[in-house]
Amino acid sequence: MADQHLHIVSFDVPSPPNYGGVIDVFYKVKALSELGVKVQLHCFQYGRPKAKELESLCVSVHYYPRHTGKHQLFNSLPYVVLSRRSEALVERLLQDEYPILFEGLHSCYYLGDHRLQGRLRLVRAHNVEHDYYTALAKAEGNAFRRTYFINEARKLQRFEPVLSEADHVLAISPKDEAYFSGHFRSVKHIPAFHACDKVEVPDGLSDFAFYHGALGVAENDQAALYLVRKVFKDLPVKLVIAGSFASGELKREIARAKNVELRENIGTEEIHRLVRQAQVNVLPTFQATGIKLKLLLCLYTGRHVVCNTPMVEGTGLAELCHVHDSPEAMRTSIISCIGKPANGQAIELRARVLEERFSNRRNAEAIVRLLR
């Protein structure tokens, strides 16, 4: 059988895989490579260096600078799309007839380009982007950034019909699949790719709860503040919060709390170690969009997971978590989990559900079938 080649256009450099979107891209590239797919990776670059590790997974890796001038905010196209354009990218794509996978609506500037007519084109939909940006606006305290998110949400909704140019739209969650199927043809649910091969939950007990996230993102800042102020206030359980770029407000709240510790700007390996060591991974969110990759990490490698409904909404994973929507119920659940090993039927169910639905290899094989 002839080699299967695939161009992947990524919105960012996907290594190191240390935040939601790039985790999906990195482990997708890895899984496809392990199946023998010859991946030609194209990355838009801003703030993240070139990554040597990608060269061992791909036959070629190309980098393109993002055009980040503020004057582009006044264009009718979304800033996140307009800033990811490069004639050098198109020229490389035109050198052969291989299929193209565009990662996210952000990278779809050339999806409808007449020069790519006739090519097999796929889009990985990481979110319903206008919903995601609307939720970011609601969580944002800074007036300028809130206005930016509102405008960007409107532009992304207007731009979204470009997905009709794709031969296949790969939705990341069942909820997103239902949305995109109402607007576009050939929509398929391909679950998120992630770092874990099998469910491995530590034995024994620990004595702390853990929350992690990119704290500079308003959604995560809001979740961390909720935990410190509402859930862990005067709770006889230690909470460790890890992430980068914590807000001044969050730092002040943590300084006042005797049972909360901040671990800032630590590496991915240390995050993974804390997920495994914690007795409870607490994962509130106020944004029910896509699927949170940190939820998968915690279910594969952590003990108990306590979260709220938006974290699991539309994912099919609610039965694997302790789901509570009030601070009081969350507090009670955390105290219950602190004294209880994570084992038995609950972990067997986790293994059955996750290894059936979130197998990187099986989901990569589903993508390969679409390329033929």
Protein language model annotation of sequence segments:
Residues 275-290, 301-303:
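Acidic donor-binding loop of glycosyltransferase active sites
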Residues 91-109, 120-122:
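Short N-terminal targeting/anchoring amphipathic segment
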Residues 88-94, 129-132, 140-169:
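Membrane-proximal helix-turn-helix segments that form the acceptor-binding/catalytic region
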Residues 84, 341-372:
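A charged, aromatic-enriched C-terminal amphipathic alpha-helix characteristic of glycosyltransferases
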Residues 189-256, 261-276:
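Conserved catalytic-core segment of nucleotide-activated headgroup transferases in glycan assembly
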Residues 100, 116-139:
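Active-site proximal beta-strand in glycosyltransferases
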Residues 1-60, 95:
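N-terminal subdomain of nucleotide-sugar transferases
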Residues 149-199:
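Donor nucleotide-sugar binding/catalytic pocket of nucleotide-sugar-dependent glycosyltransferases
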